[in-house]
């Protein structure tokens, strides 16, 4: 035999070869049987499973060993890796079932491996999925996977009640979606104890909104809408189209490559997205259908030479749209005007005018807006009641860098020194928040980010906080996710409770 270079990581030439073979491994699954001529030293060196088998067990002296495995072909590929062959897991196992079986086989051989990212599973394959999960483990990840893929017409009586309850709990949750510097999106629970990461090969843009009706995150990239479903955890991209709008309203309305779309706001009442369309000579507030993202109508149009559209906000009842314009007059002086557009009637009126720049604007509740400006090293928070056309008491403080609303009653004001929390004209301070951005969940969880450190705290106990130093957060949204199947699971559990009560 010619001299060969058999390194510890390259035994390709002797895989399934009787040369120096000291063990015959017979792999069996429900459909197939395969015999391999192998070498104990190679198996022992690369795999904890075989280390245990060949030391202290009766197989250590046997020339033939039979293993009942999940998938013979996958186990053969794993063993081939021990002999120096390239891992096939990335290129070969794209089918969801094969990826789960690969995970099961790795677990069988005591090989560390991450649970695979499963995106799309045909609902008709749910029983197959259930059988595989039963061989893996019932944990947060696998139960969520089952809940996502449970068919709406599935007979729940076939499942253990405890599993149905766990799927019900995992099919509805509160948390945060955030974006880092890389091209990825992360989903975290409210306490940031469990974080899942999804990576894509395109830039997802900067402007985004959450659509709770469909459990989707929408981000705008040029004249495209990037759409991430929190239920299927899959990604789609749509081009903003004007064909239907051209036929019905304006034949000349076009979207050019130089145009941009900014600041999307979701209107849950009408299932629409309100967005700013910036063109070369003017800006338009327009409306997109939230299913296919077609342009359906326009709300307002402004000439860029005279009016700069800066900010806009939608009331919680989705009937009042407030926007901020910087007006340039004939002598080039600038004034800022705030308008309200009543979407149910189409009426538009100016509600506020100032000679200062408005840096940001939010709705505190359905009638009161909060906005701020900075001048002469001071920050000025303003509040205004739209229904009463009345200015309300505000706050003068250090220069303001960010404002956020929590539970429709708290105003969180971030300055370059520290942070105020305002409620019912009373103030308190959070000293460890400064020069940052803040987002609040409906339950009162507060995340500060954009500074050297990220923090998690609560509106009810903001003196205590959790640092999120290991996370890179550029933008973040609170989400309340409810899968389509949640109500069915809830109704089923309630019906069993009623039957049990009637039988008592």
UniProtKB/Swiss-Prot annotation:
Domain BTB per the UniProt entry, residue ranges: 21-91
Pfam families: BTB
PROSITE patterns reported for this sequence: BTB (PS50097)
Family the UniProt entry places it in: Belongs to the mimivirus BTB/WD family.
Protein name (record): Putative BTB/POZ domain-containing protein R842
């Amino acid at each position: 035999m010619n001299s060969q270079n058999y390194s510890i990581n390259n035994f390709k030439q002797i895989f399934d070869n009787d040369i120096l073979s000291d063990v015959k491994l017979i792999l069996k699954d429900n459909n197939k049987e395969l015999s391999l001529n192998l070498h104990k030293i190679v198996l022992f060196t690369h795999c904890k499973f075989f280390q245990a088998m060949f030391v202290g067990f009766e197989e250590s002296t046997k020339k033939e060993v039979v293993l009942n495995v999940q998938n013979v072909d996958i186990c053969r590929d794993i063993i081939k890796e021990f002999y120096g062959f390239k891992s096939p897991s990335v290129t070969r196992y794209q089918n969801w079932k094969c990826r789960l079986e690969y995970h099961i086989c790795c677990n069988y051989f005591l090989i560390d491996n991450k649970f695979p990212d499963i995106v799309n599973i045909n609902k008709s394959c749910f029983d197959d999925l259930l059988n595989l999960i039963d061989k893996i483990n019932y944990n947060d990840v696998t139960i969520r996977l089952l809940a996502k893929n449970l068919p709406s017409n599935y007979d729940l009586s076939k499942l253990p009640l405890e599993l149905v309850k766990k799927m019900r709990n995992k099919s509805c949750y509160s948390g945060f979606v955030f974006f880092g510097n890389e091209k990825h999106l992360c989903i975290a629970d409210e306490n940031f104890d469990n974080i899942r990461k999804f990576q894509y090969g395109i830039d997802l843009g900067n402007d985004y909104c959450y659509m709770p009706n469909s459990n989707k995150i929408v981000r705008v990239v040029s004249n495209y809408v990037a759409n991430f479903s929190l239920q299927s955890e899959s990604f789609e991209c749509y081009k903003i189209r004007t064909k239907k709008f051209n036929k019905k309203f304006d034949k000349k309305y076009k979207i050019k490559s130089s145009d941009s779309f900014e600041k999307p706001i979701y209107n849950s009442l009408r299932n629409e997205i309100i967005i700013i369309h910036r063109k070369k000579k003017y800006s338009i507030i327009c409306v997109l259908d939230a299913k296919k993202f077609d342009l359906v109508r326009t709300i307002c149009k402004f000439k860029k030479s005279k009016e700069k559209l800066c900010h806009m906000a939608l009331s919680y009842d989705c009937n009042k749209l407030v926007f901020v314009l910087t007006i340039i007059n004939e002598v080039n002086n600038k004034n800022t005007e705030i308008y309200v557009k009543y979407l149910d009637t189409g009426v538009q009126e100016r509600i506020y005018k100032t000679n200062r720049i408005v840096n940001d604007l939010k709705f505190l509740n359905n009638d009161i807006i909060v906005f701020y400006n900075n001048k002469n090293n001071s920050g000025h928070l303003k509040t205004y009641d739209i229904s009463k056309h009345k200015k309300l008491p505000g706050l003068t403080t250090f220069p303001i860098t960010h404002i956020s609303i929590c539970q429709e009653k708290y105003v969180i004001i971030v300055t370059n020194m520290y942070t105020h929390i305002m409620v019912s004209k009373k103030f308190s301070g959070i000293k460890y928040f400064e020069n940052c951005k803040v987002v609040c969940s409906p339950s009162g969880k507060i995340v500060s980010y954009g500074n050297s450190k990220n923090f998690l705290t609560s509106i009810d106990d903001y003196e205590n906080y959790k640092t999120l130093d290991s996370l890179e957060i550029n933008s973040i949204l609170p989400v309340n996710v409810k899968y389509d199947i949640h109500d069915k699971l809830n109704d089923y559990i309630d019906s069993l409770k009623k039957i049990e009560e009637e039988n008592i």
